[in-house]
Each structure stands twice: as structure tokens, then as C-alpha cells.
Amino acid sequence: MSFALTREGIKPVAKGFALALALFQIWFTTGFGVLDGSMMRVMFVSFITVLVFLFIPCRKYKENEKEPTLFLLIDLCCAGLAIATAVYFALHLTEITTRMRYIDDVTPAAKFFAAATVLLVLEITRRTTGWALVIVASTLILYAFFGDMLPRAVKHTGFTFDVIVEHLFLLNEGVYGIPIGVATSTLFGFIMFGAFLERSKMSSIFMDLACLLTRNSQGGPAKVAIFASALFGTISGSAAANVYGTGTFTIPLMKKVGYRAPFAGAVEAVASTGGQLMPPVMGTAAFLMADLSGAGYLNVAKAALLPAILYYLALLVMIHFEAVKNDLGKLSPDMVPETKSVVSRLYYLVPIAVLILLLGMGRSVVFCANIATLSIVLLAMLKAETRFTFKSFIEALVASSRGALMVSACCACSGLIVGVLSLTGIGYKFINLITILAGDSLFLLMVYLMLTSFVLGMGIPTTPAYIVVATLGAPALIKAGAPQLVAHMFVFYYAILSFITPPVCVAAFAGAAIAESKAMETGFIALKLGIVAFIVPYMFVYQPALLGIGETPEIIWAAITAIIGVIGIAGGMQSWLLCSTSAWERAFLLIGGLSTDIIGFGLLFSVGIVQMLRRRRAPIAA
């Protein structure tokens, strides 16, 4: 029997490697096995590289187009090279870990595998996320080699090939640095948690619960999008992927009850992007922030909670005003699951409760993820429809590895970026430049950092976007006097908001594709709906109580005034509060939402009184 070498034909091999990676991670992260930390990172990157080359071709092919056998052979050779790199490290581990950095010679073999690894990492990043991150990393690597030839303002002293190889490959500074370390030890566990939750079909409770809660609310489908996307999004590492995951259900529903197509696409884009800001997982960025800021996971999650609530409150108020203003309908009865059915499945939420409880108790993040995943397997046994068979269990493990490809490739590539920044010092030059441009103005500095974070975050998934802006932008804000966690949260927000900021608003484009609307129109509506999120980071820099920093009364007062301000801004943006607003009322709402406590409350209160009196004179059907 002849064997044809095709992508489909090697799938069993690819799935075998995916299963091996999942078992490798379970064995060594749960404490059953012990492996040197450096070797674990090398093995993880090699696994990820092999899987990308086995699962993902170099380009997308049309339905009837056949992939050239030569291309597949090249991919297999690249996968073999990744395995050879791991073998090289395993055979020379003692030599590599005990050598005197920058003094001992770099062997020809090390130079070869270093060059190969860098090229392989750039290619797997391109295949999983596109060109954006690859261009940034490639530019910085070229800068490391040729930066000594540039003008004085940006030049460095020059580095030999050996020094660059050592820094990016032999030390835990480049490919095998902090980002891939977090991916290996932490992120994979949460990706596995999400994969098991989905494969068990227990995640269906998210959508059903959202439909039940909003069944009697005007414009209900848009509110379903908010609740479902907040739940799905926090365990997803990609805003665009979340749009496709929940938007295929919510966007057609929104259009059905009367929302315009671009508005429906924008709502889903903003709701899905917000999932990256919502604890406990925050698209896995919370764990990276805990490491890079040194704040610890619990402090990061606590700090992120109130701003995330403000984000979703603003979106909820805006779409409610849109629904009332245009007299949009509710969910039809056939769209709403029976209350008894939903209540009987509420225990599907127990794994998330277990995760939050264990994290709150201060247990290790890896332990929490593993126990939460185990709870899914045990609870799934209670019903035949959710129970794992041997086949579905293996499929969940394979799905875990496949789900880790994008974020892991990005972490490896981000390691290259961070490595070059630390080697050349260009990050410090950038910090000094924007500090000089801002002068003594904290506000100007924040504006420059906001714009920088937008640009650096464009088209890049959550995790690498945060790594890049945290490395370049956060130190400038810290230098200006902001607490470390506040600075990291500030740049993180704007890197994420690039997903809904034209011209490169990938989440909005995904929403537009499903809604069949114009991409840029959807993008600008998403920008409008997410406007509060663009203001909140400025608020918590000036008032850290919004991040839970300070005394309890101060935090409560900051929360109350922020909520009032958010409602004012939402009303001003939608030209609606209790009824349609006049020009001066809209101005008062916007100014009041942005103003200090007493002035802002006074302006909003005055508009509310005027509109209440107007409604009494001429009742509005809503």
C-alpha cells in the first residue's frame, strides 16, 4: 500500500506530539517529575516549534489547492531541527549552565543552533499570529548587529556575534527568558483548563446563563454578548478568537432584534476585548504581570477588578441606551433556555469557583490550574452528555497543546525582543526620550505612553503585546513616580485597546466579518463604545484607589464616583439618559463624567432632574 506524504497524512504524528507535550507538562508541573528549569524551557520551545510545523502550513491554501510536497518536507526538516536543538541542550546542559558568561568561547554548534532557533521562532510566530510581532523582533535583532553604525542618539557600542548568541540563546535572557518561562510554568495550565471546560461542553452554561439573565431586558442579545464574552474572554488569550467564539451566536441575534450590523459587530468586539481585562485570568496576562511587575498574582487580580467592572458597566449602559432610544426588542422565547435547565447545570461553574477560591487562598498558580482542571473531569462524570470518554479525554489533551501554540510562539518571540532590549539598552534610550519630551508633565507622559502602547500593540495578541509595552513603556511611568503595578496596568490597558482602535482593530474586524458590515465603520463604533476604557487608566494613575490601593473608605468612594462618571460619559456618548438629550445636556453629561467629584456630580444631577421633569410632562415609551 502506497503512502502519500500530505499534511493530513502526518496528522496522527502531529497529534502524538501534541499529546506528548500535554503529558510532559502535567508530569513536570505537578511535581511528579523533576527537570532543570532551563532544560524545561528548551523542551517546551522545541515541542511548540515541532507542533507548529506539523499542524500549520507556511500559507493558507484554497479548498481544492494541494500543498506542494517540497514545502511539507521542509516543514518536517524544520521540526527535526527543533528536536535536534533540544537534544543538543540535553547533551551539553552542564557545560551550558556552568560556563562563564561572555568569557568562555561560544562553540560552532551553539552558534548554529542559536541561529536556527531564532529563525524557527520567527517563522512559527509568523504562522500563528502574522507579521506584526515578527517585524518588531527582526528589526531589533538587526539593531543588535548593526546598531553601532546608526546616529549617536540611538547607536550602541556594538556586539560580536558570540555575545548576541550567548545573550539570546545560551542565557535565560532571550528565547528562553521570562515570557517562555511563564508560558511553560503557568499559561499552559490555564489553556488546558479552558480546553477541558470546552471539550466537556460545560462552557455552554456561559451562554445559557447570559440568555436567562437578560431575557426580559430590552436589547437583550447585546447584553448576552457582554456576559458571555466576559466569561469566555478571561480564559481566552485572543480578543479576535473570542469574537469568533461567541460572536457567531450573539451578532446574528443582535441583528435580529434590530441592532444595526456595524453596531452589533462593534458590541461583540468591545465585549470580547474586555475579557482580556477581566480577572481571574485576563487572557493569561495576569500571570505575566505578576512576574514582570513583582506585585504578585493576587494584587494584580485585585487591581484589575474595579477597572474591568467599569469597562463592562459603561458598555452595558451604552447598549441599553441604544436599545431604549431605538425601541429595540427582547430575546424571543425560543432563544431563552428553561430556568430549570440552567439551574440544574449551575454546578458547571464550580471549576471556575474552585480556581478563584484557590487563587484567593494564595496557592501556587500552577496548582490552582491543575486542581481546577481535575474538578472539571470529576464533575463532568455526573452527566452522560459531559462525561469524558477515553477518546474525548485524549482529544482534550491534544486541544490543550494546540491551544498553546499561538501564545507560546509569541512568548518565545517576545523573549527575543526583551533580550535585545536588555542587551542594547535601547529601552532606556526610549524612556529617556519620552521623559524629555514630556518634561515635568505627567499627563503628557501618559499621552505619549498611550500612543506608544497603541502602536506596539497593533495586531499582536494579548500576551506579547503586554510584554513589549511593559518592557518599553512601564519604566518611564515608574520613573515619573507611579507605583509599579499602576504603571504596568496603564500600558497593559492601551496595548489591549489597540484591538478596538482603528486602523488596526483586529477584534472589530472580526466582528465586522461576522456581522457582514464595513470594517472601519465597525471599528469606529467600537472605539466609541469602548471610550470609557481609554479614560480609566488616566483615572487610576491619578487615583490609585481605583486599583484597590489605599484605605477601604477611599476605595469605596473612588468606586462610587467612578461609576457615576462612567454613566455620565455613556449617556453623553449615546445622547440619552432618561430620555433624548439636548446639546447642552449632552455636554453637561460628558463634562460631568470627566470632572472632579463635586462638580461632576452636580452637573449629572442637574441633567437628571431636568430630564425627569421633561418625562413627567411628556412620558416616553421605553
Model-derived regions, located:
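Conserved, well-structured core domains of diverse proteins
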Residues: M1-D105, K111-A115, A621
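Long, contiguous bundles of hydrophobic transmembrane helices that form the permeation core
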Residues: S2-A14, A18, K302-G403, V506-L590, ...
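Alpha-helical transmembrane segments
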Residues: S38-S46, G181-I191, N299-A314, S364-T373, ...
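Core transmembrane alpha-helical segments of multi-pass membrane transporters/permeases
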Residues: A84, E123, T128, S138-A153, ...
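Transmembrane alpha-helix interface/packing and boundary motifs in multi-pass membrane proteins
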Residues: R126, G194-E198, S229-S238, V270-Q276, ...
